[in-house]
Amino acid sequence: MTGDRPTGKLHLGHYVGSLKRRVELQNSGEFDKIFIMIADAQALTDNADNPEKVRQNIIEVALDYLSCGLDPEKCTIFIQSQVPELCELAFYYMNLVTVQRLQRNPTVKQEIQMRGFSDDEENQNKKGTPVGFFTYPISQASDITAF
């Protein structure tokens, strides 16, 4: 299972970094099933102010997948928000992870800084960290373990 967040058009870096390998895997016969997710719900965690952009990019990403050689006859391409069980599973997982553990996650800490989020009283000019963004790793875990 793999996927992309539809935050913009895919580019050469996506092709070299993962799309080429996905096409090779789909054609290798090595796996019975290959699932490729367009992670629109995760894209909203830091694009909630522009859901139309995410919606439009779902179409762009799907077209890019097809143009790179991904074949819907050989792999399952799906949109994250269209599988409600993923959200349900993430909700259950959220009861197994503490806020403190998420706060210690180096990737979460780095992403919060990069996006200018802050829950610190001294940084009132910055916007707070959205809960959906903060719990992004839990959502990813549910996506992976569901498949």
Annotate each predicted stretch with a short phrase.
Residues 1-147:
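NTP-dependent nucleotidyl-transfer catalytic core
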